């Protein structure tokens, strides 16, 4: 939709430019193409500008509505420009009118973008590795949209991030999304889960929305080769709070793992997988 708006806005501008040039008619498509490219470059420049204004060291007490809206718009624009095809299933079951926790397998740095795109009405905040805060554009956007960074080398800091997620859900500020594998896996195999992350859903007393992503590991590779990008996002199921309240976090991890594996297929099963 956003790309179509840009394309339509470029029509009168390119016609005006063409009229002032007094050039041959075949020049008009070139003027239009150049106008569209310049518009997209200006949009990219604006994104980098607003991200440059963010101080990642300064605590962000509230979710920033401007940066969240900008993030959604740019994700939509980028997916349209790249011509990404996304097959979805089960997303009609996304809870409405309440907070929840989303968990998904993790294949690529682009995973949050696909999840954000379809959960934009849910106001998600991601639990992410600390290193992500240093990434240009991604880091500032995550900081301004209540994402919590986890230091995987420091259990105390990791627990603080989990407690903060619980607090934000209880205060009805955001819903939370986490990747229980704990990081991007180099192969497509579903790695073992870090069960501690499920404390968020238990302590906040919210349902767990189980999702799976396929083919995102090849997104950046295909982008470099200008190949078509085809991604799949499924909502596999929902574990209500009354069900997981009586389970240990390891039992929850095992249940979620099996739900994901059943949807992804046996080719995603590793040789050895033990949730901890």
Where are these regions (language model features)?
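Short acidic-hydrophobic, aromatic-tinged amphipathic segments that line or gate anion-handling sites
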Residues: 88, 148-151, 241
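Generic preference for hydrophobic
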Residues: 88, 102, 126, 233-235
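Non-catalytic C-terminal accessory region of glycerolipid acyltransferases
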Residues: 159-276
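Catalytic core of membrane glycerolipid acyltransferases/transacylases, capturing the structured
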Residues: 51-72, 80, 96-155
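Alpha-helical transmembrane spans
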Residues: 18-19
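Membrane-anchoring hydrophobic helices of lipid-metabolizing enzymes
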Residues: 2-14, 23-99
């Amino acid at each position: 939709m956003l790309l179509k708006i840009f394309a339509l806005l470029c029509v009168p501008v390119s016609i005006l430019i063409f009229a002032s040039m007094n050039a041959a008619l075949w020049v008009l498509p070139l003027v239009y193409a150049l106008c569209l490219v310049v518009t997209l470059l200006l949009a990219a420049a604006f994104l980098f500008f607003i991200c440059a204004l963010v101080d990642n060291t300064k605590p962000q007490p509230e979710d920033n509505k401007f940066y969240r809206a900008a993030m959604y718009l740019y994700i939509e624009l980028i997916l349209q420009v790249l011509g990404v095809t996304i097959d979805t299933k089960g997303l009609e079951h996304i809870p409405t009118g309440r907070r929840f926790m989303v968990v998904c397998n993790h294949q690529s740095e682009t995973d949050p973008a696909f999840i954000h795109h379809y959960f934009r009405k849910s106001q998600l905040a991601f639990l992410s590795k600390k290193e992500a805060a240093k990434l240009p554009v991604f880091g500032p956007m995550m900081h301004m949209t209540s994402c919590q960074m986890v230091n995987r080398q420091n259990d105390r800091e990791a627990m603080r991030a989990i407690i903060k997620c619980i607090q934000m859900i209880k205060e009805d500020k955001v819903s939370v999304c986490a990747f229980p594998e704990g990081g991007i896996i180099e192969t497509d195999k579903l790695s073992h889960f870090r069960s501690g992350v499920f404390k968020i859903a238990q302590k906040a007393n919210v349902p767990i929305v189980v999702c799976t992503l396929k083919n995102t590991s090849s997104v950046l590779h295909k982008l470099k080769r200008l190949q078509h990008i085809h991604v799949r996002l499924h909502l596999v199921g929902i574990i209500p709070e009354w069900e997981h309240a009586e389970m240990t976090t390891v039992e929850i991890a095992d249940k979620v793992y099996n739900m994901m594996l059943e949807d992804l297929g046996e080719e995603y099963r590793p040789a050895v997988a033990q949730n901890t």
